[in-house]
Curated annotation (Swiss-Prot):
Reactions catalysed according to its record: 2-dehydro-3-deoxy-D-gluconate + ATP = 2-dehydro-3-deoxy-6-phospho-D-gluconate + ADP + H(+)
Name recorded for this polypeptide: 2-dehydro-3-deoxygluconokinase
Underlying gene: kdgK
PROSITE patterns (alphabetical): PFKB_KINASES_2
GO molecular-function term, one example from the UniProt record: ATP binding
Organism the protein comes from: Bacillus subtilis (strain 168)
Record EC number: 2.7.1.45
C-alpha cells in the first residue's frame, strides 16, 4: 500500500439541528461526521490524494457509520480498530445558526478512541505514507492517546517523513492550561509545518504578533509556520521568507466550524503539490473560505474543479479592484 498522507484521531457521529434555536428547543437532527483529523483526511481525498485515517471506534452502529462515511470519501480505514470493550463511539450535538459559531455539546468521555495505545500503533501502515498530519486534540483525550501521539510523531520524524501539526486548542479537554500549553508546544517541536490560529498562538507563546509567534516555533524546529488570522487572511514565515495573504471574499458566513481544517487541507495539499509556501497559504485561505459558507463540518471542502473555479472567481474580483 502507498499513501500520500496519514492521520489519526477521534471521529464522532454528529447530530446537527435542522431548526434554528438552542439544543433544548430543537426537535429534529440530521446525522453527519465530525473530527478535525478526519475532516482533513476527507478534504485531501477530495483533492485526489491517497489518504489513510487510523483510530479506534466503538463496536456499535455509530462506529459502523463513521467507517462507512470515510470509505465513501475515499479515505482508507483498513487499520481502524473496533473496540471489544464497552467504550462507545463518541458523538456530538450541534445547533443551527444563521451565521457564526454554533453551540456544540460533546459526548466523548471514555470513548473508544480515547483508549488507543502505543501497543496498537500499526507502524507498517503509517510508514506507507510520506506525510503525517496531527492535531492537538488526541493528546488531550487521555494519557494513552497522549503517549500514542508522541510515539507516532517521533517514529515518523525518525523515518524522515514530513509532519504538519494544527494545535486545535480545546481547553475544556485538558486538566489545566499549563499542561495544555506545555504538551502542545512540546509536540510542535516535532513538526515541520505548524498551523496555529492567532489567538491560539498568543495563548501558547505569550507573543502578541504573528511575527513573534512564528519566530517562537521556528526556533523550536519548525521549517514553516502559517498563522490563521480569520477573515483577515493568514501570515506565514520560514527561515528565509515571510508574507501576509489577504482572506478570500466570503458572501455569507454560515458555520465557522471546520474552517481551520479547511485551511490545513489547502496548505498541506499545496505543499504536496509542489506549490510555493505563499501559494499554499493562499489555497488554505480559499478552502477555509469555502468551508465557512457551508453548514457542516466538511460540507465546504472542495474538489479540485470547485477549488479552481473559486480561485478564478477570486482573481476576477481582485482584478476588478485593480489589485493586480
Amino acid at each position: 500500500m502507498k499513501l500520500d498522507a496519514v492521520t489519526f484521531g477521534e471521529s464522532m457521529a454528529m447530530f446537527y439541528a435542522n431548526e434554528y434555536g438552542g439544543l433544548h428547543e430543537v426537535s429534529t437532527f440530521s446525522k453527519g461526521l465530525a473530527g478535525a483529523e478526519s475532516n482533513v483526511a476527507c478534504g485531501l481525498a477530495r483533492l485526489g490524494f491517497r489518504m489513510g485515517w487510523m483510530s479506534k471506534v466503538g463496536n456499535d452502529q455509530l462506529g459502523t457509520f463513521i467507517l462507512q462515511e470515510l470509505k465513501k470519501e475515499g479515505v482508507d480505514v483498513s487499520r481502524v480498530i473496533r473496540s471489544q470493550d464497552e467504550n462507545p463511539t463518541g458523538l456530538l450535538l450541534k445547533s443551527k445558526v444563521k451565521e457564526g459559531d454554533p453551540q456544540v455539546t460533546y459526548y466523548r468521555k471514555n470513548s473508544a478512541a480515547s483508549t488507543l495505545t502505543t501497543a496498537e500503533y500499526p507502524r507498517d501502515y503509517f510508514q506507507c505514507a510520506g506525510h503525517l498530519h496531527v492535531t492537538g486534540i488526541p493528546p488531550a483525550l487521555s494519557a494513552e492517546m497522549k503517549d500514542f501521539t508522541y510515539h507516532v510523531m517521533n517514529d515518523m520524524r525518525n523515518a524522515g517523513k514530513t509532519i504538519s501539526f494544527d494545535p486545535n486548542v480545546r481547553p475544556s479537554l485538558w486538566p489545566d492550561q499549563a499542561t495544555m500549553v506545555h504538551t502542545i508546544n512540546d509536540l510542535a517541536g516535532l513538526a515541520d509545518w505548524f498551523f496555529p490560529g492567532i489567538a491560539e498562538g498568543e495563548l501558547l507563546t505569550g507573543e502578541k504578533t504573528p511575527e513573534g509567534i512564528a519566530d517562537y516555533y521556528l526556533k523550536k524546529g519548525a521549517s514553516f509556520v502559517a498563522i490563521k488570522l480569520g477573515k483577515e487572511g493568514a501570515y506565514f514565515k520560514t527561515g528565509t521568507s515571510e508574507g501576509f495573504l489577504e482572506g478570500c471574499r466570503v458572501d455569507r458566513v454560515v458555520d465557522t466550524v471546520g474552517a481551520g481544517d479547511g485551511f490545513a487541507v489547502g496548505v498541506i495539499s499545496g505543499i504536496l503539490d509542489g506549490l510555493s509556501y505563499k501559494d499554499a497559504v493562499q489555497r488554505g485561505n480559499a478552502i477555509g473560505a469555502l468551508q465557512v459558507q457551508a453548514p457542516g463540518d466538511m460540507d465546504g471542502l472542495p474538489t479540485r474543479e470547485k477549488l479552481a473555479s473559486f480561485l478564478s472567481a477570486q482573481r476576477t474580483v481582485h482584478q476588478k479592484k485593480g489589485d493586480y
